[in-house]
Amino acid sequence: MAAKPFFRRRKTDPFEGENAPKIDYKDTRLLQRYISERGKIVPSRITAVGAKNQRALAKAIKRARFLALLPYAVK
């Protein structure tokens, strides 16, 4: 009997859908969820964010860092 293939469940994009939050550089609480404890942007394969939204998220995080709303690095 052959082994059954393992299928990973496809994660859904948290920014798609009706009740999805908008990506905004001023919403630091939302952006903090997509930054590691070292201050790095978490990749989309971990957060399940789509490519278009990941680019917008990265842009918002970088903008918030520039305006000193978020830190560049955490010690």
Swiss-Prot record:
UniProt cross-references to Gene3D superfamilies, sorted A to Z: Ribosomal protein S18 (4.10.640.10)
Basic residues biased stretches: 1-11
Gene Ontology biological-process annotations: translation
InterPro entries cross-referenced by the UniProt entry: Ribosomal_bS18, Ribosomal_bS18_CS, Ribosomal_bS18_sf
Record Pfam families: Ribosomal_S18
Keywords from the named record: Ribonucleoprotein, Ribosomal protein, RNA-binding, rRNA-binding
Keyword Secreted: no
A single GO cellular-component term on record: cytosolic small ribosomal subunit
GO molecular function, one term: small ribosomal subunit rRNA binding
Entry annotated with the keyword RNA-binding: yes
Residue segments, region Disordered: 1-21
Quaternary state and interactors: Part of the 30S ribosomal subunit. Forms a tight heterodimer with protein bS6.
Role this protein plays: Binds as a heterodimer with protein bS6 to the central domain of the 16S rRNA, where it helps stabilize the platform of the 30S subunit.
HAMAP family: Ribosomal_bS18 (MF_00270)
Annotated family: Belongs to the bacterial ribosomal protein bS18 family.
Listed name of the protein: Small ribosomal subunit protein bS18
Organism whose genome encodes this protein: Jannaschia sp. (strain CCS1)
